[in-house]
Amino acid sequence: FAAAEHAHKLQPTSESAAGCAQMCIKKEDYAGAIEYYKQALSMVDNDEDKADYLYRMANVYVSLHNYQQGVAHAQQALDLNPEDGRCYLLMGICYASAKVYDDPILQRSVFWVACDMFRKAKTVDSSCATDANKLIATYSQYFPSKEDVFFHRDLNEGQPFRVGGWIGKTTTCRSKAE
């Protein structure tokens, strides 16, 4: 690692910065990885490479359990490359991992938004369909029951629901298949 870092300092390129970031990730030095990805990002001109580095940074933030930054960086990558389904998959995983409600029934609304993202991933990028379908099957099991939806004053099956907290997305209220 020291040799790669030294070579990067002598002749920095986006590739050498990304390589150093990968080595930092292997050592679980996520702060270092983010810094190297920022360097890599500053050295590229084309949107495809920028989107790739932003996606990689998003993954590092997920490793740090900083889901809000994970979503923010995945969204920046999508702004540059709207057909990258991996970004939607990652955003869905971030939403599913987020804690935005104390109410255990409302907390399950994060899974609706997550599944929306997984569906979007396979719509824009067919190479993500298998992973998206697996994630939908996994996370839709955590939707609230029909009974929980019926008895909760804030929920109506099939109606729009705005998920609060930092997510701030409107989705459709759904119950799990029984």
Question: Which sequence ranges carry the predicted segments?
Answer:
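Terminal, low-structured helical/coil segments at or just beyond the last alpha-helical repeat
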Residues: 120-178
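TPR/TPR-like (Sel1-like) alpha-helical repeat modules
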Residues: 76-79, 96, 106-130, 136-140
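Short coil/turn linking the two alpha-helices of tandem helical-hairpin repeats
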Residues: 45-48, 62-65, 92, 97-106, ...
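Structural marker of alpha-solenoid helical repeat scaffolds
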Residues: 9-10, 43-46, 80, 124
